Amino acid sequence: MTAVLPLPHPLADPAPRDPRQRLQREQLRLGKRLQRQVGQAIADFGMISPGDKIMVCLSGGKDSYTMLDMLLQLQRKAPVPFTLVAVNLDQKQPDFPAHVLPAYLDALGVPFDIVEQDTYSVVSRVVPAGKTMCSLCSRLRRGALYAYAQTHGVTKIALGHHRDDIVATFFMNLFHHARLAAMAPKLRSDDGAHVVIRPLAYVREAHIAAYAQARQFPIIPCNLCGSQENLQRQQVGKMLQQWDHEQPGRVEQIARALGDVRPEQLADRTLFDFLALGRSGDAPPDLAPDPGAWLTASDATHDSD
């Protein structure tokens, strides 16, 4: 007689996942992604050397908070030793919550300095009402931070510009200054005295915003220039957002193109010797007429018409 096995009980529905656990996992993945991108940028451009004293410029915005957080995490497992000091420039803007950053940095245990310099009054006095303050404010802020770096033995100055900033700057230079230029991930200042690094060069702004929200950084809004409407950078930013919406990945493609420059396919005579094209080996330069002769011939042809 064949035994009849009892039918198995139907499987109970699995317990629903705790949304808090899912959120924590997503935040963990995002944090690891940002760490990987920051580490890659540091490696690709040689941003940090053994013994560096890095001044982390902290404005109170999402970008600089994220940059400091990433550098602190990487510092614990970095292949070379380096130190960090967070520096905020108190520009004496009205209603600026001066207590926020010291309280946050004290709780974090990070060495920091607050540099007080009333650039707000200067900008407000010099820039006409209704005009953009960003350019002058940026120059004054940069001068104050460079002066601090000079007197405190800083070897690298870390700024919180991200990938979207770099691409937007490229288009601003293209549209308004007729030049192909963006923000270098690493550069030497114009006076040659300082090395500036941008550890967030590979990180998208949307990911920074999500990370800052997850970490609940005490964000301080900029009431000086951040509130001005119709700024060129905002307009370019909206254009890039629209492009990314219409064709996801387009901004990433543009960013990668900045690292694949081909001078022979452009028209900058200082970067590529177009006059040498057509020579073979060590042949001497062609005995071509002076370029001015072509202009003279062109004018003569025009006159004869």
Curated annotation (Swiss-Prot):
<feature type="region of interest" description="Disordered">
    <location>
        <begin position="1"/>
        <end position="20"/>
    </location>
</feature>
<feature type="binding site">
    <location>
        <position position="225"/>
    </location>
    <ligand>
        <name>[4Fe-4S] cluster</name>
    </ligand>
</feature>
<keyword id="KW-0067">ATP-binding</keyword>
<feature type="short sequence motif" description="PP-loop motif">
    <location>
        <begin position="59"/>
        <end position="64"/>
    </location>
</feature>
<keyword id="KW-0819">tRNA processing</keyword>
<dbReference type="GO" id="GO:0005524">
    <property type="term" value="F:ATP binding"/>
</dbReference>
<dbReference type="GO" id="GO:0000049">
    <property type="term" value="F:tRNA binding"/>
</dbReference>
<keyword id="KW-0004">4Fe-4S</keyword>
<keyword id="KW-0694">RNA-binding</keyword>
<feature type="region of interest" description="Disordered">
    <location>
        <begin position="282"/>
        <end position="305"/>
    </location>
</feature>
<comment type="function">
    <text>Catalyzes the ATP-dependent 2-thiolation of cytidine in position 32 of tRNA, to form 2-thiocytidine (s(2)C32). The sulfur atoms are provided by the cysteine/cysteine desulfurase (IscS) system.</text>
</comment>
<dbReference type="Pfam" id="PF01171">
    <property type="entry name" value="ATP_bind_3"/>
</dbReference>
<keyword id="KW-0820">tRNA-binding</keyword>
<keyword id="KW-0411">Iron-sulfur</keyword>
<comment type="similarity">
    <text>Belongs to the TtcA family.</text>
</comment>
<dbReference type="InterPro" id="IPR011063">
    <property type="entry name" value="TilS/TtcA_N"/>
</dbReference>
<comment type="subunit">
    <text>Homodimer.</text>
</comment>
<protein>
    <recommendedName>
        <fullName>tRNA-cytidine(32) 2-sulfurtransferase</fullName>
        <ecNumber>2.8.1.-</ecNumber>
    </recommendedName>
</protein>
<keyword id="KW-0479">Metal-binding</keyword>
<keyword id="KW-0547">Nucleotide-binding</keyword>
<dbReference type="GO" id="GO:0000287">
    <property type="term" value="F:magnesium ion binding"/>
</dbReference>
<feature type="compositionally biased region" description="Low complexity">
    <location>
        <begin position="282"/>
        <end position="293"/>
    </location>
</feature>
<dbReference type="GO" id="GO:0016783">
    <property type="term" value="F:sulfurtransferase activity"/>
</dbReference>
<dbReference type="InterPro" id="IPR014729">
    <property type="entry name" value="Rossmann-like_a/b/a_fold"/>
</dbReference>
<dbReference type="GO" id="GO:0051539">
    <property type="term" value="F:4 iron, 4 sulfur cluster binding"/>
</dbReference>
<keyword id="KW-0963">Cytoplasm</keyword>
<keyword id="KW-0408">Iron</keyword>
<keyword id="KW-0808">Transferase</keyword>
<dbReference type="GO" id="GO:0034227">
    <property type="term" value="P:tRNA thio-modification"/>
</dbReference>
<feature type="binding site">
    <location>
        <position position="137"/>
    </location>
    <ligand>
        <name>[4Fe-4S] cluster</name>
    </ligand>
</feature>
<dbReference type="InterPro" id="IPR035107">
    <property type="entry name" value="tRNA_thiolation_TtcA_Ctu1"/>
</dbReference>
<dbReference type="GO" id="GO:0005737">
    <property type="term" value="C:cytoplasm"/>
</dbReference>
<keyword id="KW-0460">Magnesium</keyword>
<comment type="pathway">
    <text>tRNA modification.</text>
</comment>
<feature type="binding site">
    <location>
        <position position="134"/>
    </location>
    <ligand>
        <name>[4Fe-4S] cluster</name>
    </ligand>
</feature>
<dbReference type="InterPro" id="IPR012089">
    <property type="entry name" value="tRNA_Cyd_32_2_STrfase"/>
</dbReference>
